[in-house]
């Protein structure tokens, strides 16, 4: 995995390189004439709302890193349950800002954010815990991954809204694979009375291909790499895995008990 695992410092340069590329693509698409109020692959969000969302979250990250560096107290985490609604409201709150002005603000924020991430030391990458507005304290490397999620997936959203055939970047997908298990663990909502079960997840190709055993119980979801020969398996390529985890498509291949697969795939709420 090495340089393709953003959770380790060895993956930092690769992750930031891909984030830069996706951010440039995102703003190049968003600044085109005639697209500002166009629909996107993110339900009820227009292109301008995606830009507003990036401005909103990135500027909040600056405050959060300042708090982490200064040992300052912040309010308790909002929680991920209300994240989709609040993020949508915040993104739409910038609708009165002209296209050129908001795109330039987004580019400026990104330049500042990438500089902040580039300056992180090996100790910072995994050891500096930064209080995320929705999720609470997380290692700093998650903020690089959040930038990739936003720029990578929302670039896909802009293209999806155009109605043209397209696909997710392989580099984006490969880097995000490990983080999708974290996303699933944060958004699983099993019924308290439901019987525990296991399922296998197979990523068929790319830098983070492999098999993962996922255990689901009343308290949530846990996962670990391991043999899945005895389990029902959901098989994905990297791109369809990321897009399925984000609720953008219904991807994957079931190998085994469809009822187990359906039960698993319907565990999650969207953020």
Where are these regions (language model features)?
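Amphipathic alpha-helix face/heptad-repeat signature
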Residues: 15-22, 53, 102-109, 143-147, ...
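C-terminal interaction segments
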Residues: 226-271
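Short, helix-capping/interhelical loops that line the mouth of catalytic, cofactor-
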Residues: 2-13, 60-119
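A glycine-rich beta-turn/hairpin centered on an aromatic-Pro dipeptide
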Residues: 174-214
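Non-cleavable N-terminal signal-anchor transmembrane helices
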Residues: 1-42
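Short, contiguous alpha-helical
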Residues: 34-81, 130-189
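Acidic/His-leaning functional-site neighborhoods
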Residues: 203-233, 237
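Contiguous mid-protein beta-loop-alpha structural module that forms a pocket-lining wall or clamp
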Residues: 93-156, 160-161
């Amino acid at each position: 995995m090495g340089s393709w695992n953003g959770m380790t410092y060895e993956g930092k340069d690769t992750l930031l390189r891909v984030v830069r590329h996706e951010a440039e693509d995102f703003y190049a698409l968003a600044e085109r004439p005639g697209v500002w109020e166009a629909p996107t692959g993110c339900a009820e969000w227009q292109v301008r709302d995606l830009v507003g969302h990036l401005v909103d979250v990135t500027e909040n990250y600056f405050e959060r890193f300042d708090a982490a560096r200064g040992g300052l107290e912040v309010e308790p985490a909002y929680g991920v349950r209300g994240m989709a609604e609040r993020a949508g409201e915040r993104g739409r709150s910038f609708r009165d800002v002209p296209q050129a002005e908001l795109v330039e603000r987004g580019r400026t924020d990104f330049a500042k954010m990438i500089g902040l991430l580039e300056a992180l030391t090996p100790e910072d990458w995994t050891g500096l815990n930064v209080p995320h507005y929705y999720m609470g304290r997380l290692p700093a490397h998650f903020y690089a991954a959040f930038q990739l999620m936003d720029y990578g997936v929302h670039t896909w959203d802009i293209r999806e809204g155009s109605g043209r055939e397209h696909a997710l970047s392989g580099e984006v997908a490969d880097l995000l694979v490990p983080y999708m298990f974290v996303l699933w663990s944060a958004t699983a909502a099993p019924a308290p009375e439901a019987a525990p079960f296991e399922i296998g997840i197979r990523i068929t190709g790319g830098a983070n291909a492999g098999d993962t055993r996922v255990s689901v119980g009343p308290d949530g979801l846990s996962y670990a790499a391991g043999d899945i020969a005895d389990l029902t398996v959901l098989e994905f390529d990297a791109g369809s895995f990321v897009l399925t985890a984000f609720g953008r498509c219904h991807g994957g291949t079931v190998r085994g008990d469809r009822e187990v697969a359906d039960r698993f795939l319907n565990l999650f709420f969207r953020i």
